[in-house]
Swiss-Prot record:
It catalyses: tRNA(His) + L-histidine + ATP = L-histidyl-tRNA(His) + AMP + diphosphate + H(+). Homodimer. This is Histidine--tRNA ligase. It is found in: Cytoplasm. GO terms for cellular component: cytoplasm. One of its GO terms (molecular function) is histidine-tRNA ligase activity. Its EC number is 6.1.1.21. One of its GO terms (biological process) is histidyl-tRNA aminoacylation. Belongs to the class-II aminoacyl-tRNA synthetase family. It is an enzyme of class 6 (ligase). HAMAP family: His_tRNA_synth. Pfam families: HGTP_anticodon, tRNA-synt_His. The keyword Protein biosynthesis applies.
């Protein structure tokens, strides 16, 4: 007996009941994005490895530890399963001249991302993100729009206990001044740094401020703050974002240790967090990345965006009672005999042609067993075709969930009869015809 194969650890199957919930959630998200004028874009799952090294940063956990990378056996090209979407989206915009040729772009995407992490609750090796990118917008208004968009989605989903944290990372020269001061400070406390801190001291010291190590909290709490190195322009930008948020009635907390894990961010950064998902409490994060387009070889363009983890957001939504009811078919078609089976195919297609959902029974069985499956499907109506109906070119229409007996109608009158049963409660006798 051969060994049973299973999915890769940390990469999960999404089975039909759960997948229907995902689709319902995705419909809500698509409507929300379109209401703000964002348009879909789809990028490959596999990209050149240098794209992520250049965009995310060589000295980041993602690039150093978490990417699924391999060498193409055909041409030796180094490729990577995408660990995030922003770099791919910006690459596509540059390659196809979207911003330079067509002006500022509001774009969104959703799909799987891949990181080689230790699987745990809320953290997977294949996970799904919804990403939003605004390319070619320089002002604080787009930063605020992104945050306000999220607040509206939480309201649409009925989510509670999701709070906003914001910070400003300033401009490159301001971060450089702060970086020098931070390194000088941390050198005085080098003996207290853990292994990650020692490794990042000279390569990415800002990330030390984001440590979860409780022993390092006194050190990072007393560290120089980036806010003290911001120039007038960066301060004005951040102040304007806060003013928009206050006007929108969105509460927030300034978190001076919020730095994000990707090197391309500047100025505004934000996270929406919750305490209801355990340690993995971030459900959405983003900010401004004005230098990334030029960094990836395009004409310099300002940009901002955010991404949300679908698995975490779904868990929060379901915890808040957001899971939809299962969508049952309108009709289940049962049949007995060769002639009845042929007519059943015609009946099912006729109903689908009028906008009804219909499941055609396959696999044989008695009328009793087929009717049991019809009832179990949740369908509102069974269309019944036996030898007598088939000989007469007629079908039986039997309500399964409401009052009324079975009626026989011609194939031409089937859709009208089904509509009459389905919509009788609303007084719509011609529904679907």
């Amino acid at each position: 007996m051969s060994q049973t194969l299973q999915a890769v650890r940390g990469m999960n199957d999404i089975l039909p009941d759960e997948a229907e919930t995902w689709e319902h959630f995705e419909d809500i998200v698509r409507d929300w994005l379109k209401s703000y004028g964002y348009r879909p874009i789809r990028m490959p799952l596999v990209e050149p490895t240098p794209l992520f090294k250049r965009a995310i940063g060589e000295v980041t956990d993602i690039v150093e530890k978490e990417m699924y990378s391999f060498e193409d056996a055909l041409n030796g090209e180094h490729l990577t399963l995408r660990p995030e979407g922003t770099a791919s989206c910006v690459r596509a915009a540059i390659q196809h001249n979207l911003v330079a040729g067509h002006g500022p772009q509001r774009l969104y995407y959703h799909g799987p991302m891949f990181r080689h992490e230790r699987p745990q609750k809320g953290r997977y090796r294949q996970f799904h993100q919804i990403g939003v990118e605004a390319l070619g917008f320089a002002g604080p208004d787009i930063d605020a729009e992104h945050i306000i968009m999220c607040a509206r989605l939480w309201d649409d989903l009925g989510l509670e206990d999701v709070s906003l944290e914001i910070n400003s990372l300033g401009a490159a020269e301001e971060r450089a001044q702060h970086r020098a001061a931070l390194i000088a400070y941390l050198e005085q406390h080098r003996d207290k740094l853990d292994e990650d801190g020692q490794r990042r001291l000279y390569t990415n010291p800002l990330r030390i401020l984001d440590t979860k190590n409780p022993d390092l909290q006194p050190v990072v709490e007393a560290a120089p703050r980036l806010a003290d190195y911001l120039g007038d322009e960066s301060r004005a930008h951040f102040d304007a974002v806060q003013l928009f948020l206050k006007d929108a009635g969105i509460p927030y907390r300034i978190n001076h240790r919020l730095v994000r894990g990707l090197d391309y961010y500047n100025r505004t950064v934000f996270e929406w967090v919750t305490t209801r998902l355990g340690a993995q409490g971030t459900v959405c994060a983003g900010g401004r990345y004005d230098g990334l387009v030029a960094q990836l070889g395009g004409k310099p363009q300002p940009a901002a965006g955010f991404a949300m983890g679908v698995e975490r957001l779904l868990a929060l939504w379901q915890e808040s009672g957001g899971e939809p009811e299962r969508q049952a078919p309108d009709v289940y078609v049962v049949h007995l005999g060769e002639a009845a089976q042929r007519l059943a195919f015609q009946a099912a297609e006729a109903l689908r042609g009028h906008g009804f959902s219909a499941v055609l029974h396959c696999g044989g069985g008695s009328f009793k067993s087929q009717m049991k499956k019809a009832d179990g499907s949740g369908a509102s109506i069974a269309v019944v075709i036996g030898e007598d109906e088939a000989a007469a070119g007629e079908v039986g229409v039997k309500p399964l969930r409401g009052p009324g007996g079975q009626q026989r109608v011609t194939l031409a009158a089937l859709a009208e009869a089904v509509g009459g049963v389905l919509y009788s409660d609303q007084g719509d006798d011609d529904g679907g015809v």
